[in-house]
Swiss-Prot record:
Lineage: Bacteria, Pseudomonadati, Chlamydiota, Chlamydiia, Chlamydiales
Compartments (UniProt record): Cytoplasm
A Gene Ontology molecular function term of the record: glutamine-fructose-6-phosphate transaminase (isomerizing) activity
Task performed by this protein: Catalyzes the first step in hexosamine metabolism, converting fructose-6P into glucosamine-6P using glutamine as a nitrogen source.
Keyword Repeat among UniProt keywords: yes
Active site residues of this protein: 2 (nucleophile), 604 (for fru-6p isomerization activity)
Stated name of the protein: Glutamine--fructose-6-phosphate aminotransferase [isomerizing]
Enzyme's top EC category: transferase
Domain SIS: 280-426, 458-599
Gene this chain is encoded by: glmS
Source organism of this protein record: Chlamydia abortus (strain DSM 27085 / S26/3)
Pfam families per UniProt: GATase_6, SIS
Amino acid sequence: MCGIFGYLGSKLAIPVVLDGLAKLEYRGYDSAGLASIHLGDLFVRKTIGRVDELRHSLEQENIQSLLAIGHTRWATHGVPTVSNAHPHVDENRTCAVVHNGIIENFKELKSFLLSEGVSFSSDTDSEVIAQLFAYRYQTTADLIHSFSWTLSQLQGSFSCGLIHKDHPDVLLCAAQESPLILGLGEGENFIASDSRAFLKHTQSIQALASGELAIVGLGHEVETYNFALKRISKPVRQVTYTDAGSDKQGYSYYMLKEIYEQPEVLERLVHKYLDPQGHISEKFLQGFPLEDFDEISIVACGSSYHAGFLAKYIIESLVSIPVHVEVASEFRYRRAYIGQKTLAILISQSGETADTLAALKEFRRRQVSCVLGICNVEESALATGVDHCLFLEAGIEIGVASTKAFTAQLLLLILLGLKLTISKHTLSLTEHCACGKGLLELPELCNRLLANENLHSWAHTYCNEDRFIFLGRRLMYPICMEAALKLKEIAYVEANCYPAGEMKHGPIALISKGSPVITFCGDSTVYEKMVGCIMEVKARQAHVIAVASEAQEDIAAVSDFQIYVPNSHSLASPILYTIVGQIMAYTMALKKGNEIDCPRNLAKSVTVE
Protein backbone atom coordinates (compact mmCIF):
# COMPACT_ATOMS: atom_id res chain seq x y z
CA MET A 1 0.00 0.00 0.00
CA CYS A 2 3.10 2.20 -0.14
CA GLY A 3 5.60 3.14 -2.80
CA ILE A 4 9.35 2.52 -2.49
CA PHE A 5 11.99 4.06 -4.73
CA GLY A 6 15.77 3.95 -4.48
CA TYR A 7 18.66 5.16 -6.63
CA LEU A 8 22.41 4.63 -6.72
CA GLY A 9 24.36 5.95 -9.68
CA SER A 10 26.21 8.84 -11.24
CA LYS A 11 23.47 11.48 -10.96
CA LEU A 12 22.41 13.52 -7.96
CA ALA A 13 20.09 11.07 -6.27
CA ILE A 14 17.44 13.24 -4.64
CA PRO A 15 15.90 14.68 -7.85
CA VAL A 16 15.77 11.16 -9.34
CA VAL A 17 14.07 9.79 -6.24
CA LEU A 18 11.54 12.63 -6.10
CA ASP A 19 10.55 12.00 -9.71
CA GLY A 20 10.25 8.28 -9.01
CA LEU A 21 8.09 8.87 -5.95
CA ALA A 22 5.76 11.10 -7.96
CA LYS A 23 5.11 8.14 -10.26
CA LEU A 24 4.38 5.92 -7.26
CA GLU A 25 2.03 8.31 -5.52
CA TYR A 26 -1.01 6.30 -6.61
CA ARG A 27 0.15 3.67 -4.09
CA GLY A 28 -0.27 6.02 -1.12
CA TYR A 29 -0.26 9.73 -0.37
CA ASP A 30 -0.65 10.14 3.38
CA SER A 31 2.98 11.22 3.70
CA ALA A 32 6.30 11.10 1.87
CA GLY A 33 9.97 11.12 2.72
CA LEU A 34 13.49 10.30 1.62
CA ALA A 35 16.91 9.59 3.07
CA SER A 36 20.38 10.15 1.68
CA ILE A 37 23.97 10.31 2.91
CA HIS A 38 25.53 13.77 3.10
CA LEU A 39 28.99 14.54 4.49
CA GLY A 40 29.13 11.16 6.22
CA ASP A 41 25.77 11.46 7.98
CA LEU A 42 22.23 10.47 7.20
CA PHE A 43 20.03 13.19 5.75
CA VAL A 44 16.33 12.49 6.27
CA ARG A 45 13.38 14.65 5.25
CA LYS A 46 9.72 13.70 5.78
CA THR A 47 6.47 15.56 5.19
CA ILE A 48 2.75 14.99 5.61
CA GLY A 49 0.75 14.88 2.40
CA ARG A 50 1.75 14.55 -1.22
CA VAL A 51 5.18 14.23 -2.84
CA ASP A 52 4.98 17.88 -3.94
CA GLU A 53 5.11 18.86 -0.26
CA LEU A 54 8.32 16.89 0.13
CA ARG A 55 9.77 18.42 -3.03
CA HIS A 56 8.95 21.92 -1.79
CA SER A 57 10.61 21.25 1.57
CA LEU A 58 13.87 20.38 -0.21
CA GLU A 59 14.11 23.45 -2.43
CA GLN A 60 16.70 25.16 -0.21
CA GLU A 61 18.78 22.03 0.39
CA ASN A 62 21.95 21.18 -1.53
CA ILE A 63 22.55 17.48 -0.94
CA GLN A 64 25.36 16.22 -3.17
CA SER A 65 24.70 12.50 -2.88
CA LEU A 66 24.56 9.70 -5.43
CA LEU A 67 22.47 7.46 -3.16
CA ALA A 68 18.94 7.95 -1.82
CA ILE A 69 15.85 6.00 -0.88
CA GLY A 70 12.31 7.37 -0.78
CA HIS A 71 8.82 6.39 0.23
CA THR A 72 5.24 7.49 -0.25
CA ARG A 73 2.92 6.13 2.42
CA TRP A 74 -0.56 4.77 2.90
CA ALA A 75 -0.84 4.26 6.64
CA THR A 76 -1.41 0.78 8.08
CA HIS A 77 0.32 1.14 11.48
CA GLY A 78 0.30 4.59 13.06
CA VAL A 79 -1.59 7.68 11.95
CA PRO A 80 -0.14 9.93 9.21
CA THR A 81 2.39 12.07 11.09
CA VAL A 82 5.95 13.13 10.36
CA SER A 83 7.28 10.72 12.98
CA ASN A 84 5.37 7.82 11.43
CA ALA A 85 6.38 8.71 7.87
CA HIS A 86 9.24 6.86 6.18
CA PRO A 87 12.20 6.54 6.02
CA HIS A 88 12.72 5.28 9.55
CA VAL A 89 16.10 5.42 11.25
CA ASP A 90 17.64 3.66 14.20
CA GLU A 91 18.13 5.53 17.46
CA ASN A 92 21.73 6.46 16.57
CA ARG A 93 20.86 7.52 13.00
CA THR A 94 23.24 5.07 11.36
CA CYS A 95 20.77 3.48 8.93
CA ALA A 96 17.52 4.39 7.19
CA VAL A 97 14.78 2.04 5.99
CA VAL A 98 11.80 2.35 3.66
CA HIS A 99 9.21 -0.40 3.92
CA ASN A 100 6.02 -1.57 2.26
CA GLY A 101 3.89 -4.23 3.91
CA ILE A 102 3.14 -5.41 7.41
CA ILE A 103 5.52 -6.90 9.97
CA GLU A 104 3.19 -9.25 11.79
CA ASN A 105 5.52 -9.90 14.74
CA PHE A 106 6.62 -6.30 15.24
CA LYS A 107 5.22 -6.16 18.79
CA GLU A 108 7.38 -9.07 19.90
CA LEU A 109 10.44 -7.63 18.15
CA LYS A 110 9.82 -4.18 19.59
CA SER A 111 9.43 -5.62 23.10
CA PHE A 112 12.74 -7.42 22.72
CA LEU A 113 14.53 -4.29 21.52
CA LEU A 114 13.00 -2.18 24.29
CA SER A 115 14.28 -4.71 26.80
CA GLU A 116 17.73 -4.21 25.27
CA GLY A 117 17.49 -0.48 25.90
CA VAL A 118 16.60 0.61 22.36
CA SER A 119 14.50 3.79 22.09
CA PHE A 120 11.74 4.14 19.48
CA SER A 121 10.42 7.35 17.96
CA SER A 122 7.31 6.20 16.05
CA ASP A 123 4.23 3.98 16.35
CA THR A 124 4.93 2.02 13.17
CA ASP A 125 5.93 -1.58 12.57
CA SER A 126 8.47 -0.34 10.01
CA GLU A 127 10.82 1.26 12.54
CA VAL A 128 11.49 -2.20 13.95
CA ILE A 129 13.45 -3.07 10.79
CA ALA A 130 15.87 -0.17 11.21
CA GLN A 131 16.30 -0.71 14.94
CA LEU A 132 16.75 -4.47 14.58
CA PHE A 133 19.33 -4.08 11.82
CA ALA A 134 21.31 -1.51 13.83
CA TYR A 135 21.17 -3.73 16.91
CA ARG A 136 22.73 -6.59 14.95
CA TYR A 137 25.21 -4.41 13.10
CA GLN A 138 26.61 -3.07 16.38
CA THR A 139 27.68 -6.62 17.18
CA THR A 140 28.87 -7.89 13.80
CA ALA A 141 29.89 -4.75 11.85
CA ASP A 142 28.92 -6.85 8.81
CA LEU A 143 26.44 -5.03 6.57
CA ILE A 144 25.22 -7.98 4.51
CA HIS A 145 24.99 -10.56 7.28
CA SER A 146 23.23 -8.07 9.55
CA PHE A 147 20.66 -7.44 6.82
CA SER A 148 20.18 -11.17 6.21
CA TRP A 149 19.76 -11.83 9.94
CA THR A 150 17.26 -8.99 10.28
CA LEU A 151 15.15 -10.37 7.44
CA SER A 152 15.18 -13.81 9.02
CA GLN A 153 13.54 -12.35 12.15
CA LEU A 154 10.64 -10.69 10.32
CA GLN A 155 7.25 -12.33 9.84
CA GLY A 156 4.71 -11.01 7.38
CA SER A 157 4.69 -9.65 3.86
CA PHE A 158 7.08 -6.83 3.11
CA SER A 159 9.53 -5.21 0.76
CA CYS A 160 12.17 -2.80 1.96
CA GLY A 161 15.22 -0.76 1.10
CA LEU A 162 18.06 0.13 3.49
CA ILE A 163 21.07 2.43 3.44
CA HIS A 164 23.85 2.88 6.02
CA LYS A 165 25.81 6.07 6.59
CA ASP A 166 29.16 4.23 6.52
CA HIS A 167 28.39 2.59 3.16
CA PRO A 168 27.46 5.36 0.72
CA ASP A 169 27.98 3.08 -2.27
CA VAL A 170 25.60 0.26 -1.24
CA LEU A 171 21.82 0.01 -1.38
CA LEU A 172 20.24 -3.08 0.18
CA CYS A 173 16.74 -4.29 -0.59
CA ALA A 174 14.55 -7.34 -0.06
CA ALA A 175 11.10 -8.73 -0.81
CA GLN A 176 8.84 -11.16 1.01
CA GLU A 177 5.44 -11.58 -0.67
CA SER A 178 5.50 -7.90 -1.67
CA PRO A 179 6.61 -6.43 -5.00
CA LEU A 180 10.04 -4.93 -5.54
CA ILE A 181 11.60 -4.42 -8.97
CA LEU A 182 15.25 -3.72 -9.76
CA GLY A 183 16.11 -1.41 -12.65
CA LEU A 184 19.55 -1.95 -14.18
CA GLY A 185 20.94 1.05 -16.02
CA GLU A 186 24.28 2.20 -17.41
CA GLY A 187 26.32 3.05 -14.33
CA GLU A 188 23.16 3.42 -12.26
CA ASN A 189 20.62 1.15 -10.62
CA PHE A 190 17.12 1.58 -9.22
CA ILE A 191 14.68 -0.16 -6.92
CA ALA A 192 10.95 0.51 -7.04
CA SER A 193 7.60 -0.96 -6.10
CA ASP A 194 6.57 -0.52 -9.75
CA SER A 195 8.98 -0.57 -12.69
CA ARG A 196 7.12 2.26 -14.38
CA ALA A 197 8.68 4.61 -11.84
CA PHE A 198 12.11 4.25 -13.47
CA LEU A 199 11.29 3.34 -17.09
CA LYS A 200 12.48 6.67 -18.45
CA HIS A 201 15.96 5.66 -17.23
CA THR A 202 16.08 1.95 -18.09
CA GLN A 203 13.92 -0.88 -19.38
CA SER A 204 16.21 -3.63 -18.06
CA ILE A 205 14.62 -5.15 -14.98
CA GLN A 206 14.81 -7.95 -12.46
CA ALA A 207 11.88 -8.72 -10.18
CA LEU A 208 12.79 -9.92 -6.71
CA ALA A 209 10.93 -13.10 -5.85
CA SER A 210 9.62 -13.72 -2.36
CA GLY A 211 12.47 -14.50 0.02
CA GLU A 212 15.15 -12.72 -2.01
CA LEU A 213 17.45 -9.80 -1.24
CA ALA A 214 19.69 -7.75 -3.48
CA ILE A 215 22.93 -5.85 -2.97
CA VAL A 216 22.96 -2.85 -5.27
CA GLY A 217 26.45 -1.44 -5.69
CA LEU A 218 27.84 1.59 -7.47
CA GLY A 219 28.99 0.85 -11.00
CA HIS A 220 28.75 -2.94 -10.91
CA GLU A 221 26.13 -5.63 -11.28
CA VAL A 222 23.39 -6.21 -8.78
CA GLU A 223 23.93 -9.31 -6.66
CA THR A 224 20.89 -11.34 -5.65
CA TYR A 225 20.65 -13.85 -2.79
CA ASN A 226 18.06 -15.68 -0.80
CA PHE A 227 17.64 -14.64 2.82
CA ALA A 228 20.19 -17.30 3.84
CA LEU A 229 22.73 -15.59 1.52
CA LYS A 230 22.84 -18.30 -1.12
CA ARG A 231 23.66 -16.59 -4.44
CA ILE A 232 20.89 -16.61 -7.02
CA SER A 233 21.35 -16.11 -10.74
CA LYS A 234 18.50 -14.03 -12.13
CA PRO A 235 17.98 -13.21 -15.80
CA VAL A 236 17.62 -9.60 -16.87
CA ARG A 237 14.39 -8.93 -18.72
CA GLN A 238 13.73 -6.15 -21.18
CA VAL A 239 10.24 -4.75 -20.71
CA THR A 240 8.36 -3.74 -23.82
CA TYR A 241 6.20 -1.03 -22.30
CA THR A 242 7.26 2.52 -21.49
CA ASP A 243 6.10 5.24 -19.13
CA ALA A 244 4.02 6.76 -21.93
CA GLY A 245 0.69 7.83 -20.52
CA SER A 246 2.16 8.86 -17.21
CA ASP A 247 1.24 12.50 -17.85
CA LYS A 248 -2.25 13.97 -18.22
CA GLN A 249 -1.85 14.90 -21.90
CA GLY A 250 -4.03 17.98 -21.60
CA TYR A 251 -6.74 16.49 -19.41
CA SER A 252 -7.48 17.99 -16.02
CA TYR A 253 -7.29 14.63 -14.26
CA TYR A 254 -5.81 11.21 -14.92
CA MET A 255 -9.18 9.60 -14.32
CA LEU A 256 -10.79 11.69 -17.04
CA LYS A 257 -7.96 10.89 -19.44
CA GLU A 258 -8.27 7.20 -18.68
CA ILE A 259 -12.03 7.25 -19.20
CA TYR A 260 -11.52 8.73 -22.66
CA GLU A 261 -8.75 6.23 -23.46
CA GLN A 262 -11.20 3.33 -23.19
CA PRO A 263 -12.23 3.25 -26.86
CA GLU A 264 -8.56 2.89 -27.81
CA VAL A 265 -7.94 0.13 -25.25
CA LEU A 266 -11.04 -1.78 -26.34
CA GLU A 267 -10.17 -1.38 -30.01
CA ARG A 268 -6.71 -2.81 -29.39
CA LEU A 269 -8.16 -5.90 -27.72
CA VAL A 270 -11.04 -6.59 -30.11
CA HIS A 271 -8.81 -6.30 -33.17
CA LYS A 272 -6.20 -8.52 -31.55
CA TYR A 273 -8.63 -11.30 -30.68
CA LEU A 274 -11.50 -11.03 -33.21
CA ASP A 275 -11.37 -11.22 -36.99
CA PRO A 276 -13.57 -8.90 -39.11
CA GLN A 277 -16.29 -11.57 -39.25
CA GLY A 278 -16.47 -11.67 -35.46
CA HIS A 279 -14.81 -15.05 -35.01
CA ILE A 280 -12.49 -15.29 -32.03
CA SER A 281 -8.85 -15.71 -32.93
CA GLU A 282 -6.83 -18.81 -32.12
CA LYS A 283 -4.36 -16.42 -30.43
CA PHE A 284 -6.80 -16.00 -27.56
CA LEU A 285 -5.71 -18.56 -24.94
CA GLN A 286 -3.91 -20.50 -27.65
CA GLY A 287 -3.13 -24.02 -26.48
CA PHE A 288 -5.12 -23.53 -23.28
CA PRO A 289 -7.23 -26.68 -22.60
CA LEU A 290 -10.60 -25.03 -21.97
CA GLU A 291 -12.40 -28.22 -22.95
CA ASP A 292 -10.94 -29.96 -19.88
CA PHE A 293 -12.93 -27.90 -17.37
CA ASP A 294 -16.53 -28.28 -16.28
CA GLU A 295 -16.68 -25.45 -13.74
CA ILE A 296 -14.93 -22.18 -12.99
CA SER A 297 -13.88 -20.51 -9.73
CA ILE A 298 -13.16 -16.77 -9.98
CA VAL A 299 -11.45 -14.97 -7.10
CA ALA A 300 -10.85 -11.21 -6.95
CA CYS A 301 -11.26 -8.02 -4.88
CA GLY A 302 -12.99 -4.68 -5.40
CA SER A 303 -13.70 -3.72 -8.99
CA SER A 304 -12.06 -6.94 -10.19
CA TYR A 305 -14.63 -8.87 -8.17
CA HIS A 306 -17.40 -7.02 -10.00
CA ALA A 307 -15.79 -8.00 -13.31
CA GLY A 308 -15.75 -11.61 -12.17
CA PHE A 309 -19.38 -11.36 -11.09
CA LEU A 310 -20.38 -10.21 -14.57
CA ALA A 311 -18.37 -13.09 -16.03
CA LYS A 312 -20.48 -15.49 -13.98
CA TYR A 313 -23.68 -14.21 -15.60
CA ILE A 314 -22.23 -14.25 -19.11
CA ILE A 315 -20.40 -17.58 -19.01
CA GLU A 316 -23.28 -19.42 -17.37
CA SER A 317 -25.67 -18.05 -20.00
CA LEU A 318 -23.37 -18.90 -22.90
CA VAL A 319 -22.11 -22.35 -21.94
CA SER A 320 -24.19 -23.48 -18.93
CA ILE A 321 -21.28 -24.45 -16.68
CA PRO A 322 -21.25 -23.35 -13.04
CA VAL A 323 -19.16 -20.28 -12.21
CA HIS A 324 -18.37 -19.47 -8.58
CA VAL A 325 -17.20 -15.95 -7.74
CA GLU A 326 -15.40 -15.36 -4.46
CA VAL A 327 -14.16 -12.28 -2.62
CA ALA A 328 -10.46 -12.99 -2.23
CA SER A 329 -10.25 -11.81 1.38
CA GLU A 330 -12.90 -14.40 2.33
CA PHE A 331 -11.90 -17.24 0.02
CA ARG A 332 -8.85 -18.39 1.98
CA TYR A 333 -10.85 -18.66 5.21
CA ARG A 334 -13.55 -20.99 3.93
CA ARG A 335 -13.39 -24.44 2.45
CA ALA A 336 -14.86 -23.62 -0.94
CA TYR A 337 -15.57 -26.61 -3.15
CA ILE A 338 -12.96 -27.07 -5.86
CA GLY A 339 -13.38 -30.06 -8.17
CA GLN A 340 -10.78 -31.89 -10.23
CA LYS A 341 -12.01 -30.12 -13.36
CA THR A 342 -12.17 -26.62 -11.90
CA LEU A 343 -10.56 -23.76 -13.80
CA ALA A 344 -9.33 -21.17 -11.30
CA ILE A 345 -9.29 -17.55 -12.46
CA LEU A 346 -7.61 -14.78 -10.46
CA ILE A 347 -8.22 -11.16 -11.42
CA SER A 348 -6.08 -8.23 -10.24
CA GLN A 349 -5.29 -5.05 -12.13
CA SER A 350 -1.88 -4.66 -10.49
CA GLY A 351 -1.16 -8.35 -10.14
CA GLU A 352 0.01 -7.60 -6.59
CA THR A 353 -3.26 -7.62 -4.61
CA ALA A 354 -2.35 -9.36 -1.36
CA ASP A 355 -5.60 -11.27 -0.83
CA THR A 356 -5.68 -12.44 -4.44
CA LEU A 357 -2.11 -13.70 -4.19
CA ALA A 358 -3.09 -15.51 -1.00
CA ALA A 359 -5.87 -17.18 -3.00
CA LEU A 360 -3.26 -18.25 -5.57
CA LYS A 361 -1.34 -19.95 -2.76
CA GLU A 362 -4.53 -21.68 -1.65
CA PHE A 363 -5.23 -22.95 -5.17
CA ARG A 364 -1.68 -24.29 -5.35
CA ARG A 365 -1.99 -25.91 -1.93
CA ARG A 366 -5.14 -27.65 -3.08
CA GLN A 367 -3.42 -28.77 -6.29
CA VAL A 368 -5.79 -27.09 -8.72
CA SER A 369 -4.68 -28.25 -12.14
CA CYS A 370 -4.77 -24.89 -13.90
CA VAL A 371 -4.83 -21.26 -12.76
CA LEU A 372 -5.53 -18.43 -15.20
CA GLY A 373 -4.62 -14.86 -14.31
CA ILE A 374 -5.99 -11.59 -15.66
CA CYS A 375 -3.91 -8.50 -14.92
CA ASN A 376 -2.23 -5.42 -16.37
CA VAL A 377 1.40 -5.85 -15.26
CA GLU A 378 3.70 -8.35 -16.92
CA GLU A 379 6.28 -8.67 -14.13
CA SER A 380 3.71 -8.88 -11.32
CA ALA A 381 3.57 -11.73 -8.83
CA LEU A 382 0.24 -12.86 -10.25
CA ALA A 383 1.46 -12.90 -13.85
CA THR A 384 4.53 -14.91 -12.97
CA GLY A 385 2.74 -17.24 -10.56
CA VAL A 386 -0.16 -18.52 -12.68
CA ASP A 387 -0.14 -21.10 -15.46
CA HIS A 388 -1.35 -18.63 -18.08
CA CYS A 389 -2.07 -14.90 -17.94
CA LEU A 390 -4.29 -12.68 -20.05
CA PHE A 391 -2.94 -9.13 -20.05
CA LEU A 392 -5.27 -6.14 -20.13
CA GLU A 393 -2.91 -4.12 -22.36
CA ALA A 394 -4.59 -1.03 -20.95
CA GLY A 395 -1.40 0.94 -20.43
CA ILE A 396 -0.54 2.60 -17.17
CA GLU A 397 -3.59 3.55 -15.10
CA ILE A 398 -2.82 6.21 -12.49
CA GLY A 399 -6.24 7.27 -11.24
CA VAL A 400 -7.00 5.29 -8.09
CA ALA A 401 -10.57 4.60 -9.21
CA SER A 402 -10.15 2.05 -12.00
CA THR A 403 -11.67 2.83 -15.38
CA LYS A 404 -9.92 1.51 -18.49
CA ALA A 405 -8.39 -1.46 -16.66
CA PHE A 406 -11.85 -2.50 -15.48
CA THR A 407 -13.47 -2.35 -18.91
CA ALA A 408 -10.49 -4.27 -20.34
CA GLN A 409 -11.15 -6.94 -17.70
CA LEU A 410 -14.80 -7.09 -18.74
CA LEU A 411 -13.89 -7.48 -22.39
CA LEU A 412 -11.36 -10.27 -21.77
CA LEU A 413 -13.87 -12.14 -19.60
CA ILE A 414 -16.56 -11.77 -22.26
CA LEU A 415 -14.08 -13.10 -24.84
CA LEU A 416 -13.36 -16.00 -22.51
CA GLY A 417 -17.06 -16.82 -22.49
CA LEU A 418 -17.11 -16.62 -26.27
CA LYS A 419 -14.08 -18.91 -26.51
CA LEU A 420 -15.78 -21.42 -24.22
CA THR A 421 -18.72 -21.65 -26.62
CA ILE A 422 -16.32 -23.15 -29.15
CA SER A 423 -14.87 -25.80 -26.84
CA LYS A 424 -18.31 -26.59 -25.38
CA HIS A 425 -20.16 -26.38 -28.75
CA THR A 426 -22.99 -24.25 -27.37
CA LEU A 427 -23.33 -21.66 -30.17
CA SER A 428 -23.63 -22.03 -33.90
CA LEU A 429 -21.02 -20.31 -36.05
CA THR A 430 -23.60 -17.68 -37.00
CA GLU A 431 -24.46 -16.97 -33.36
CA HIS A 432 -20.79 -16.90 -32.39
CA CYS A 433 -19.91 -14.39 -35.11
CA ALA A 434 -22.90 -12.21 -34.23
CA CYS A 435 -21.54 -11.92 -30.70
CA GLY A 436 -18.07 -11.10 -32.00
CA LYS A 437 -19.37 -8.46 -34.39
CA GLY A 438 -21.24 -6.85 -31.52
CA LEU A 439 -17.97 -6.57 -29.61
CA LEU A 440 -16.17 -5.15 -32.66
CA GLU A 441 -18.61 -2.23 -32.55
CA LEU A 442 -17.58 -1.31 -29.01
CA PRO A 443 -14.90 1.34 -29.77
CA GLU A 444 -17.24 3.35 -32.00
CA LEU A 445 -20.14 3.01 -29.55
CA CYS A 446 -17.92 4.16 -26.68
CA ASN A 447 -16.92 7.26 -28.62
CA ARG A 448 -20.58 8.03 -29.29
CA LEU A 449 -21.42 7.56 -25.63
CA LEU A 450 -18.60 9.81 -24.43
CA ALA A 451 -19.90 12.58 -26.68
CA ASN A 452 -23.23 12.57 -24.79
CA GLU A 453 -23.30 15.82 -22.79
CA ASN A 454 -26.21 14.56 -20.70
CA LEU A 455 -23.73 12.24 -18.98
CA HIS A 456 -22.13 15.27 -17.34
CA SER A 457 -25.25 17.28 -16.56
CA TRP A 458 -26.84 14.93 -14.04
CA ALA A 459 -24.52 16.06 -11.23
CA HIS A 460 -25.88 19.62 -11.42
CA THR A 461 -29.23 18.29 -10.24
CA TYR A 462 -28.09 15.73 -7.69
CA CYS A 463 -24.79 17.06 -6.30
CA ASN A 464 -26.31 17.84 -2.89
CA GLU A 465 -27.56 14.29 -2.35
CA ASP A 466 -25.53 12.14 0.02
CA ARG A 467 -27.24 8.77 -0.45
CA PHE A 468 -28.11 6.86 -3.61
CA ILE A 469 -29.65 3.49 -4.35
CA PHE A 470 -28.61 1.60 -7.50
CA LEU A 471 -30.88 -1.05 -8.99
CA GLY A 472 -30.16 -3.51 -11.77
CA ARG A 473 -31.08 -6.96 -12.98
CA ARG A 474 -29.12 -9.75 -14.62
CA LEU A 475 -26.12 -8.30 -16.56
CA MET A 476 -26.80 -4.84 -15.19
CA TYR A 477 -26.58 -5.89 -11.54
CA PRO A 478 -22.75 -6.31 -11.43
CA ILE A 479 -22.42 -3.09 -13.42
CA CYS A 480 -24.58 -1.28 -10.87
CA MET A 481 -22.32 -2.66 -8.14
CA GLU A 482 -19.33 -1.13 -9.88
CA ALA A 483 -21.12 2.19 -10.44
CA ALA A 484 -22.04 2.37 -6.76
CA LEU A 485 -18.43 1.65 -5.79
CA LYS A 486 -17.20 4.44 -8.05
CA LEU A 487 -19.59 6.91 -6.43
CA LYS A 488 -18.32 5.89 -2.99
CA GLU A 489 -14.66 6.03 -4.00
CA ILE A 490 -14.48 9.54 -5.40
CA ALA A 491 -17.76 11.32 -4.61
CA TYR A 492 -17.72 10.16 -0.96
CA VAL A 493 -21.46 9.49 -0.90
CA GLU A 494 -23.29 6.46 0.40
CA ALA A 495 -24.28 4.36 -2.59
CA ASN A 496 -26.00 1.03 -2.06
CA CYS A 497 -26.68 -1.46 -4.83
CA TYR A 498 -29.38 -4.12 -4.90
CA PRO A 499 -30.82 -6.55 -7.43
CA ALA A 500 -34.00 -4.80 -8.48
CA GLY A 501 -36.10 -7.83 -7.57
CA GLU A 502 -34.88 -7.61 -3.97
CA MET A 503 -36.35 -4.18 -3.29
CA LYS A 504 -39.55 -5.57 -1.80
CA HIS A 505 -37.49 -7.79 0.54
CA GLY A 506 -36.26 -4.93 2.68
CA PRO A 507 -34.40 -2.13 0.86
CA ILE A 508 -37.61 -0.38 -0.18
CA ALA A 509 -37.91 0.70 3.47
CA LEU A 510 -35.09 3.15 2.72
CA ILE A 511 -37.19 4.99 0.14
CA SER A 512 -38.76 8.29 1.13
CA LYS A 513 -39.91 11.36 -0.74
CA GLY A 514 -37.17 12.53 -3.09
CA SER A 515 -34.82 9.57 -2.52
CA PRO A 516 -32.56 9.33 -5.60
CA VAL A 517 -32.69 5.88 -7.19
CA ILE A 518 -30.43 5.09 -10.16
CA THR A 519 -31.71 2.28 -12.37
CA PHE A 520 -29.64 0.57 -15.06
CA CYS A 521 -32.15 -0.77 -17.57
CA GLY A 522 -29.77 -2.01 -20.26
CA ASP A 523 -30.61 -5.72 -20.18
CA SER A 524 -33.47 -6.11 -22.65
CA THR A 525 -34.46 -9.55 -21.37
CA VAL A 526 -35.57 -8.05 -18.04
CA TYR A 527 -36.52 -4.56 -19.19
CA GLU A 528 -40.21 -4.90 -18.31
CA LYS A 529 -39.26 -6.17 -14.86
CA MET A 530 -37.09 -3.07 -14.38
CA VAL A 531 -39.97 -0.81 -15.38
CA GLY A 532 -42.14 -2.54 -12.78
CA CYS A 533 -39.52 -1.92 -10.10
CA ILE A 534 -39.29 1.73 -11.10
CA MET A 535 -43.04 2.05 -10.68
CA GLU A 536 -42.75 0.59 -7.18
CA VAL A 537 -40.18 3.13 -6.00
CA LYS A 538 -42.01 5.96 -7.80
CA ALA A 539 -45.10 5.02 -5.80
CA ARG A 540 -42.99 5.84 -2.71
CA GLN A 541 -42.10 9.23 -4.26
CA ALA A 542 -38.52 8.32 -5.15
CA HIS A 543 -36.66 10.40 -7.72
CA VAL A 544 -35.57 8.01 -10.49
CA ILE A 545 -32.51 8.45 -12.70
CA ALA A 546 -32.90 5.92 -15.52
CA VAL A 547 -29.98 4.72 -17.62
CA ALA A 548 -31.40 2.98 -20.67
CA SER A 549 -30.72 2.28 -24.33
CA GLU A 550 -31.73 4.67 -27.08
CA ALA A 551 -34.41 2.16 -28.08
CA GLN A 552 -36.04 2.48 -24.66
CA GLU A 553 -37.25 6.06 -24.93
CA ASP A 554 -40.47 5.09 -23.17
CA ILE A 555 -38.48 5.02 -19.93
CA ALA A 556 -38.95 8.80 -19.81
CA ALA A 557 -42.59 8.31 -18.90
CA VAL A 558 -41.72 6.63 -15.59
CA SER A 559 -38.46 8.37 -14.60
CA ASP A 560 -37.33 11.88 -13.67
CA PHE A 561 -33.94 12.02 -15.40
CA GLN A 562 -32.71 9.94 -18.31
CA ILE A 563 -29.30 9.00 -19.68
CA TYR A 564 -29.45 7.17 -22.99
CA VAL A 565 -26.83 4.67 -24.11
CA PRO A 566 -26.27 3.66 -27.76
CA ASN A 567 -28.03 0.47 -28.80
CA SER A 568 -25.65 -2.48 -28.76
CA HIS A 569 -25.32 -6.24 -28.67
CA SER A 570 -26.18 -7.65 -25.25
CA LEU A 571 -22.56 -8.72 -24.64
CA ALA A 572 -21.30 -5.21 -25.36
CA SER A 573 -23.86 -3.36 -23.25
CA PRO A 574 -22.21 -3.97 -19.83
CA ILE A 575 -19.11 -2.10 -20.96
CA LEU A 576 -21.10 0.88 -22.22
CA TYR A 577 -23.12 1.09 -19.01
CA THR A 578 -19.91 0.82 -16.99
CA ILE A 579 -18.65 3.99 -18.66
CA VAL A 580 -21.88 5.76 -17.71
CA GLY A 581 -21.22 4.88 -14.07
CA GLN A 582 -17.66 6.19 -14.33
CA ILE A 583 -18.77 9.52 -15.75
CA MET A 584 -21.55 9.85 -13.17
CA ALA A 585 -19.03 9.39 -10.34
CA TYR A 586 -16.46 11.69 -11.93
CA THR A 587 -18.92 14.55 -12.50
CA MET A 588 -20.39 14.21 -9.00
CA ALA A 589 -16.92 14.29 -7.41
CA LEU A 590 -15.94 17.26 -9.56
CA LYS A 591 -19.08 19.15 -8.56
CA LYS A 592 -18.35 18.47 -4.90
CA GLY A 593 -14.78 19.71 -5.28
CA ASN A 594 -13.26 16.36 -4.29
CA GLU A 595 -9.80 15.06 -5.14
CA ILE A 596 -10.39 12.99 -8.28
CA ASP A 597 -7.20 11.01 -8.86
CA CYS A 598 -6.19 10.38 -5.25
CA PRO A 599 -9.38 10.01 -3.18
CA ARG A 600 -9.10 9.99 0.57
CA ASN A 601 -8.07 6.83 2.41
CA LEU A 602 -7.55 4.82 -0.78
CA ALA A 603 -4.54 3.43 -2.61
CA LYS A 604 -4.32 2.02 -6.11
CA SER A 605 -2.51 -1.21 -5.30
CA VAL A 606 -3.64 -3.06 -2.17
CA THR A 607 -0.53 -5.02 -1.27
CA VAL A 608 -1.42 -5.75 2.37
CA GLU A 609 -4.22 -7.93 3.68
